Amino acid sequence: MEMSIRPRRLRSCENLRRMVRETRVSPESLIYPLFLIEGENIKEPIPSLDGQYRYSPDRVWEEIESCLAAGVSRVLLFGIPAHKDACGSSAWDPNGVVQQGIRAIKEKYPQMYIVTDVCMCEYTDHGHCGILCGHNVDNDKTLEVLAKTALSHVEAGADMVAPSDMMDGRIAAIRETLDDHGYVNTPIMSYSAKYASAFYGPFRDAAGSAPAFGDRRGYQMDPHNRKEAMKECALDVEEGADILMVKPALSYLDIIRECSDAFDLPMAAYSVSGEYAMIKAAGKAGLIDEHRVMCESALSIYRAGANILITYFAKELAKAMQEGELG
């Protein structure tokens, strides 16, 4: 039998397989999510996220050093305040937990690139992502507090802001506020297509942000919808977003691919807490090879079109990339 085309030729040895890889990744594309809790001398494990911790601002340096040693130089900060109220006023407090954390990191590790999550759910006493009018989130009133929060983060030293609230018009509101205060070069990474997903459970435990009533389907996207994601991304581009994001990642690889193909902005994907927790639990139970599944799932997200990956596995993935196992 004569065969002139034999795909196996390019799979014959590891050196050759690495040379012809179609998807190339590096630690420069990784962002590590980090939880800051108000207080002092705190490092507490997060039961729902094996291997992850909440840090007070005075101890966050421990995790920053660990990230830098692993080759990860970008973090995404989430805050857990001591005080919560109806309007989430701790979110834009100049001495709030995120603002303290930003200053603490930048003072000691100016090379660390800091992205901050901009939302209200961790700061409101009702756990919803904005200002309530009855039992509904008032979209337009929420825009003002989101913009104030983003500005307070940038004034504290944040390099980039990432609004995750899913209010209509938030990118335009934040962009205008930052520009008006002279921060025209501060980029916005928008949670553009953020779905109302069941995969967020461990995060809500970690951040203490579960809604006190109802759910978030009135503002986060319906998992049934594909075209709506394109509309959300297009609106964010029009309003001035610099980076688009799809969240979650693994169950929405089709959305990552379509948005990546359709728009010329960098595409981020957030491999969320539920994805991480499932891999950790299955690995601990001996059902899967945790390391290989971690690498394979991350690779699938990049292959779908993501340029940036936000993941709790960032440090482990950076090592795999540096050793040539991935990318």
Could you say what each language-model-derived stretch is?
Residues M1-R21:
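N-terminal amphipathic/basic leader segments beginning at the initiator methionine
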